[in-house]
Amino acid sequence: MSINSPQYSLPSKKEKQRVRELRKFINHHNYLYYTLDDPEISDSEYDKAFQELLTLENTFPSLKTNNSPTQKVGNNILKKLEEQPHRQRMYSLDNVFSNDEWEGFLKRLANALPEVPFSFWCDPKMDGLALELIYEKGQLTSALTRGDGDIGEVVTEAVRTISNIPKRLKHSINAPELLEIRGEVVISRADFKKLNKEQEKKKKKLFANPRNAASGSVRQLDPTITASRPLRFLAYGIGEIQPSSLKWNTYHELMSYLKEYGFETPPKGKLCISSTEVQSYYTRLQAQRYSLRYEIDGIVMKLDDIQSQEKLGYTSRAPRFAIAWKFPATQVQTRLLQIHIQVGRTGVLTPVAELEPINVGGATISRATLHNEDEIKNKDIRPGDMVIVQRAGDVIPEIVSPILSDRSAKSKPFVFPKICPVCHEKVYRINNEVAWRCINLSCPAIRLQSIIYFVSKSGLNIQGIGQRLIELLVTSGCIKTPADLFTLTTADLLTYKRMGAKLAAKTIQALSLAKQTMSLHRLICALGIRHVGEQTARILASSFIDLDALSSASLEDLQQLSEIGPEVASSIQAFFKNKANIQMINQFREMNIWPIQQVNDTTTKGFFTGKKLLFTGTLERPRAEMKRLAEEAGAIVMTGISHKLDYVIAGKNPGSKLNKAQELHISILDEPTFLQKLLIVL
């Protein structure tokens, strides 16, 4: 198709920028939700952003990339648990939100499978942690979380403590050689309330919702913690099965077999033989939603005929034969007491609504995000208003609108502050942004958040130094910049309550290790330069020998680099021109914290430069390290098998991906050969 044809249009600069903004927003909230189990926004806000990105990518196919969140499942996994690849990818589900969208899904099925009558296995969409149980000859041998879909966290010992998970399958004499059971770990509403009461008695942090409690309970290094939590596993499908001839004709038969093997399955599961039955099922479960034992946020429909499922296959992210129909967000009314302003790391002033506490779908809500001044004005939200609050099973809800009929005649519009509430300096709107910013880098709020970011996983990832310790160090005046962290002594730390000699020594040791192992790209990333994340930091580290070279780069020099436009270039230059930042960089130099460009960061062409690779099976080295080595050698690491791959690096027990690679005549390398070829320079 010609790009000049009427069916193909090129995106404008504004549309390209919007795609970048949406990807950054979605990736950030994926990390909070999947990795930290600590979501900040409602499902409906997330779904709205995801659907907008999906629409833009479908309208302008040139914008679609393999690393877009629309092409991936979940997020990276935490590093503290061992990781292991799935034999078969654990996919996510695409969503529909209305009857029209459901009908659209049916039309796509009909176009792909004409003249095939459709029946659907329907069950509730459970809101928990996705899990894979691996049985060999009927015996439970391992358990993995979904992770990023390709690689999961090994949680076998924790999972063995969940009472309703069979350690040995019923009728195990006839069990397959290998059977992977997939399902969801959940906590009932009643058990969740009891758990939070216990947390409260112990003066521990309360869990935000049952999903967070379930996820956090499974992802424990100490299985006794998991054992103390009221977890249940509900099985909804299978992964790999060997021998592969042992398969079922329909999904409802499979669900019956899961029960026979001893698994609990999602309640209210039903075979629906028509679209009308599916719609009735949706309406019925929506009405029963809050009377069910477990929290649900929609229903899942899968084609019942498994042969039809296999014909339809998968996209990079989700099956084509299944869909989740999400319930609308729960709405309630409460009083908006007042609006507070918070100041973040980049100086953004964020309004937060303080609400009269109200129960929404089993959770007590007392705060809601208002995002920015424009949202407050557009919705005409005022302190003292009765407001409609919307929550879709998450932590922070959103205010939909005020109830104008209840508004007092004395009500006044909220006036957004034009000075920073922390340092009392003037705030600005830069380049027509919606956000107001404090640009005073000496602002205590910015300084605090900058140092917290510096040591965080997104920064240097210094173990054992958390937000609370940074707050103590900053408020007491012990440190003022990230560089000051490396001047700390054990004696400094021992002046603080609850800081014993052992913990103080461990903290200093962690700082010393960070100083010794710091790479240039990691330091650039940790500086918290606006618009500079890990990928951009890598590009900068591969293009400039040290911070001096980067700080003296012109706008033209910066804009010549891939993925760096005028806005990012201006932000980088502004950072290095700031007096406080110049002083901090000089501090790093004086303390000999001065990483330089590594050999791996140069543009020397190696064996794998520009090649597309995929890792499968269990490797001797951690998967994350192998991925890093490949990327530093110039390779592109893929997650799915396709004819575009150049090499598959296979470890032990590679599963079906190896077979598919051989069918496509893709070159196969073992781990030692891969490591050997990394050293070849062309």
From Swiss-Prot:
Binding positions (Zn(2+)): C420, C423, C438, C443
GO molecular function: DNA ligase (NAD+) activity; metal ion binding
Pfam families: BRCT, DNA_ligase_aden, DNA_ligase_OB, DNA_ligase_ZBD, HHH_2, HHH_5, Nlig-Ia
Entry's transmembrane regions: none
GO BP, one annotated term: DNA replication
Keyword field: DNA damage, DNA repair, DNA replication, Ligase, Magnesium, Manganese, Metal-binding, NAD, Zinc
Name listed for the protein in its UniProt record: DNA ligase
Organism: Lawsonia intracellularis (strain PHE/MN1-00)
Gene name, Swiss-Prot/TrEMBL: ligA
